[in-house]
Amino acid sequence: MSNTVVCALYRFVSLENYQEIQAPLLKMMQANNIKGTLLLAQEGINGTVAGSREDINTLIAWLKSDPRLNKLTTKESFTEENPFYRTKVKLKKEIVTMGVEGIDPKRTAGSYVKPKDWNALISDPDVLLVDTRNDYEISIGTFKNAVDPKTTNFREFPQYVKDNLDPAVNKKVAMFCTGGIRCEKSTAYLKEQGFDEVYHLEGGVLKYLEEVPQEESMWQGECFVFDNRVSVNHKLEKGQYDQCHGCRLPITEDDKKSDKYQEGVCCHQCHEQLTVEQKQRFAQREKQVGLAKQRGQTHIGNDAVAQLENNRLKKQAVKQAQRVEAKK
């Protein structure tokens, strides 16, 4: 049974003292062995973390003890192993980066649509369905009839809207993303640009996969996630994709058969873009990861830091014992 809870969370709310929250939040996560990354900004909090059921409950309770975060949006899935190596709390200008000043989802945003009502909305021929995620995310799964903006990052989305959408033509626009947070900003942006009927999938794709039976689903493929699982299927279980360590893009078992694929180094998508030095560095890293696994250790992440410190202390103890023995 999968016993690690993966929890995606966010909340757009004014956090004037967000910088002061960083240290106690990080300490709290470390004390409860929670891994993952949370972003703090004046506009709110966002991130994905993983840990035991008890520890995740403790974290959520801690966050919601702040009245500003008591309506925190959370979505959960489950996995065998923790998909994160490190524990981080970062300070940011935005909790999801669009790069447009003045966009405030707290003030204006699109209409939320529950997962159970989503199929009916996107089946309306008058509705333009837009996937707000990046091209590499869309490549492994999306909703039937969704438009792919072909953006490589969320900063490119406003330009896509300016070049391709028109309030006079696109009377009804529905948008979706992985967990809902990007759509908070994308729908707010469209409203600011004069679009009237703007909708977005409440809770994102992850909530849809959780609540809509697979036999009724209009989702096609798998859903990309930003952790070591790479993708999840309709049951929210780890999907069939792995990740290239050279370019961080999803790859299939067939992709690994390419003569341009080298485990831990590169794939057919980045083989020509990486320098010789980069490939050598990645190959050395992969070698160290393999050696660490043979020793039953971790090469990267918080555990690796602890192991290095433990090894250092052991060496000190050995040297001290040798000095004591030499004096006899």
Curated annotation (Swiss-Prot):
EC number(s) reported in the record: 1.14.-.-
Positions of the catalytic residues: C177
Start and end residues of each Rhodanese domain: 123-217
Transmembrane segments: none
Single GO MF annotation: oxidoreductase activity, acting on paired donors, with incorporation or reduction of molecular oxygen
InterPro entries in the cross-refs: Rhodanese-like_dom, Rhodanese-like_dom_sf, TrhO, TRHO_N
SMART domains the record matches: RHOD
GO biological process: tRNA modification
Keywords: Oxidoreductase, tRNA processing
Catalytic function, reaction form: uridine(34) in tRNA + AH2 + O2 = 5-hydroxyuridine(34) in tRNA + A + H2O
Any single Pfam family the record assigns to this protein: UPF0176_N
Superkingdom: Bacteria
Similarity comment text for this entry: Belongs to the TrhO family.
Role: Catalyzes oxygen-dependent 5-hydroxyuridine (ho5U) modification at position 34 in tRNAs.
Protein name: tRNA uridine(34) hydroxylase
Source organism of this protein record: Psychromonas ingrahamii (strain DSM 17664 / CCUG 51855 / 37)
Gene from which the chain derives: trhO
